[in-house]
Amino acid sequence: MLALAKANSATYPEIDFVRADGTLLPFGDGSFDAAISAATLHHCEPAAAVSFLRELRRVARVAPIVGDLRRTPAAYGGARIIALLSRNRLTKNDAPLSVRRSYTPREAYELALEAGWRRPSVRPTAWFRLLLYDAA
């Protein structure tokens, strides 16, 4: 994946790609204006999620921003229907599992508090997603 990203951005030599553990990022405090995560949080067990969110807060000078799945009964039902209709093996197995492993807005808020976010805010968004950010 990194090789593809590098190839696609070859005309932008100022862009760097780094593979790293999200719970121990190799960047200094406040290295970025924002630290953005998309569709990652649901892959983390709660303890790892707290470590991950703590690292995002640490490296973000202004705000960490997390977009992820939002666990609801309707989201799980939709994922099951998609899995039943799909021919793709990954979709069949991953869609319902990802929804089951995702967090509710309240759970995401609590994880962010535990990670030391000063003023976490969670907003439900379309298609059973949520947006979590530190409004501090």
What are these regions (language model features)?
Residues 36-37:
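A conserved beta-strand element that flanks and buttresses the S-adenosyl-L-methionine
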Residues 40:
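Hydrophobic adenine-recognition pocket in adenosine-nucleotide-binding enzymes
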Residues 5-6:
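Conserved SAM-binding loop
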Residues 11-28:
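Conserved SAM-binding strand-loop segment of SAM-dependent methyltransferases
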Residues 1:
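Conserved short alpha-helix immediately C-terminal to the canonical SAM/SAH-binding motif I
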Residues 69-121:
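C-terminal alpha-helical "lid/dimerization" subdomain adjacent to the S-adenosyl-L-methionine
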Residues 44-59, 66:
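A short, conserved alpha-helix within the catalytic core of class I
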Residues 126, 130-136:
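C-terminal lobe and adjacent flexible extensions of AdoMet/dcAdoMet transferase-like proteins
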